[in-house]
Amino acid sequence: MPQKDLLETIIEQVRPLLGKGKVADYIPALAEVDPTKLGIAVTTIDGQTIGAGDYLEPFSIQSISKVFSLTVALTLYEEAEIWSRVGKEPSGQSFNSLVQIELERGVPRNPFINAGALIIADLLQSRLGAPKHRMLEVVRKLSANPHVIYDKRVAASEYEHSARNAAIAYLMKSFGNFNNDVDRVLRNYFHYCALKMSCADLSKAMLYLANRGQSLSAEQVVSPIQTRKLNALLATSGLYDGAGEFAYRVGMPGKSGVGGGIIAVIPGDMSICVWSPELDKNGNSLAGTAALEKLSQALGRSIF
């Protein structure tokens, strides 16, 4: 377990990076976030959580929600059903690319780009009567926080600027790889992205990825083998087009979101979340990545 003073030191070491990135501005509600926010939290497999900086302040988790969506899908479907609809390869394209969908006949490269996450949302819609309710239930349970909510203003803001995601969904539908009403699936998807959670919430919620599929409450969320596979996907595809850079610098499976959060996992040991809203050119938190790199170096830990 890292000590709290180590986390506080790391926060101060990366603070000079604030002002060098850019807050996501294509979602108006996200553009208003204070760019100086900076937090880190760690939860160990024995259930302890420590943090530093703004680690208790909720933020919009955005694409980090794709980990929860895929996890829920794995509890509802045989794996072969999921992987017949979406691939497992890094994309090498922007996270909202239409070109790749056209070239690969409606099958997205992986579940962590927008197209792949929309397929997962479509799968959830097919099996769940109230997907939004189920997702909130799952996340509250995993984080041990019954007060986690959807930020309805962020969800509405994303829906109002949803033309590209709608285009992706309709293009996949034209190839026969989308089964439900596009508008309904989009509304659910934007709600998942609009979950508001703190670094502490997320480090707790993602503990199952570090603990062979067991959550903070010792529930078996997914099997140990599924957990290993999830971590493999996170290591190769979790950081948009910056996955290689992240693996090189940080050396952990991870997932980022344009809200400035990044979750990372040291299997068998701990789950981590950092938050700093300013992003680098790949859409990943600039100071957050640096904080994870420093933590990895300080602990001498990497999966490689």
Curated annotation (Swiss-Prot):
Subunit structure: Homotetramer.
Binding site for substrate: 63, 114, 158, 165, 189, 240, 258
Record Pfam families: Glutaminase
Species of provenance: Shewanella loihica (strain ATCC BAA-1088 / PV-4)
Gene label: glsA
GO biological process terms held by the UniProt record: glutamate biosynthetic process; glutamine catabolic process
PANTHER family: GLUTAMINASE
EC number in record: 3.5.1.2
One Gene Ontology molecular-function label: glutaminase activity
Protein name: Glutaminase
Protein family: Belongs to the glutaminase family.
Catalysed conversion reaction: L-glutamine + H2O = L-glutamate + NH4(+)
